[in-house]
From Swiss-Prot:
Keywords: Cell cycle, Cell division, Mitosis, Nucleus, Phosphoprotein
UniProt entry tagged with the keyword Lipid metabolism: no
GO biological process, one term: negative regulation of G2/M transition of mitotic cell cycle
Organism listed in the record: Drosophila melanogaster (Fruit fly)
The protein's name: Protein Z600
A GO MF label: cyclin binding
Amino acid sequence: MSSTNETNQVLQRLNSLKIVETPKEQHEFGKRECYSLDSKKYSLVPATPSSSGHGKFQTELKKRRKNKLNRMYTYEADKNFIKARKSLNF
């Protein structure tokens, strides 16, 4: 019996809520980092909708990050290989 009462209260609260759209100025101040409202201002945000068409994203940043990671991995691998080579007296 108490659970139905609680659901009724929740439903009443939901009904009393009003849907308000945030003005565009407030959107731009870091509220939504995942995409930009105009891609000219934030041209290199990851997954920014590009001007080349609907559903396409700019991936320059991702590529750059991947290259950096690969560089770090190869450096670590080289370091370990040099250590192993020294221990085996090649």
